Curated annotation (Swiss-Prot):
Keyword Heme listed: no
UniProt KW Cell inner membrane keyword: yes
Membrane topology, as annotated: Peripheral membrane protein
Main localization (coarse): membrane
Pfam families recorded: Syd (PF07348)
Location of this chain's protein in the cell: Cell inner membrane
Species this chain originates from: Shewanella amazonensis (strain ATCC BAA-1098 / SB2B)
Protein name: Protein Syd
InterPro entries for the chain: Syd, Syd_sf
Length: 215
């Protein structure tokens, strides 16, 4: 099974868990942002959490611009994980605790993601640490779930530090160990002076970026 197949399967299991437990699709706060994955009866401008479901992209999105800017070859799993689907945040339970996978809400989300991954890679280079890129958060202190770009292994990582605990041999293997966490959507209040939050990234990137930059 590929990373994309494992991610698609988790989306399907995630949706089924919400339908079985709550009788409805997963919901998230949209912050007024449209998305292809909003359900037909969803209201993007509503302040209430709206139902969503995974939608395949018509064209695969890639990270060639980030690779070119850093003059490195990014591990192919990054395109599998981020480039094929639109979706909301995926909350999970795992052998290592609760967490959240970052997913792409809309095209603006993808641009923001590229900027944040580029910033993360630049920070790792500056610190002379192994190159990693993130796929989510885990634990109570917003540790990152990151992928070692050299070999595709999945790690637990604190922003600005080297990865400190290997979680899986691959992103595919990591995804297969997750279980959907059926829980109410979380609302992250953003300071008025910051950029509007993107629900697909669900404020996770902003928290990580603040950790990386100290702002």
């Amino acid at each position: 099974m590929s990373c994309l197949a494992a991610l698609t399967k988790f989306h399907e299991i995630y949706k089924a868990a919400f339908v079985e437990r709550l009788g409805e699709l997963p919901r998230c706060f949209t912050h007024g942002r449209p998305s292809p994955c909003l359900a037909d009866d969803a209201l993007a401008g509503s302040e209430e959490p709206q139902p969503w479901q995974m939608v395949p992209r018509r064209e695969v999105a890639v990270f060639n611009n980030v690779s070119h800017a850093m003059d490195i070859e990014l591990h192919h799993d990054i395109d599998d994980f981020y480039g094929h689907l639109f979706g909301g945040p995926l909350q999970f339970d795992s052998p290592w605790g609760e967490g959240e996978l970052i997913q792409i809400w809309n095209e603006d989300d993808f641009v923001l993601l590229q900027q944040n991954i580029l910033g993360h890679l630049m920070m790792k280079k500056q610190l002379k640490q192994p190159q990693t890129w993130f796929v989510g958060l885990i634990g109570d202190v917003d540790e990152m779930v990151s992928v070692n770009n050299a070999d595709g292994t999945v790690w637990r990582e604190v922003a600005g530090q080297e990865p400190h605990e290997q979680l899986a041999e691959s992103l595919e293997a990591f995804l297969q160990q997750l279980k959907p966490r059926v829980a109410p959507p979380q609302y992250h209040q953003e300071p008025a002076a910051t950029v509007n939050p993107h629900p697909g990234i669900f404020a996770s990137l902003k928290r990580m970026w603040q950790n990386l930059t100290g702002r």
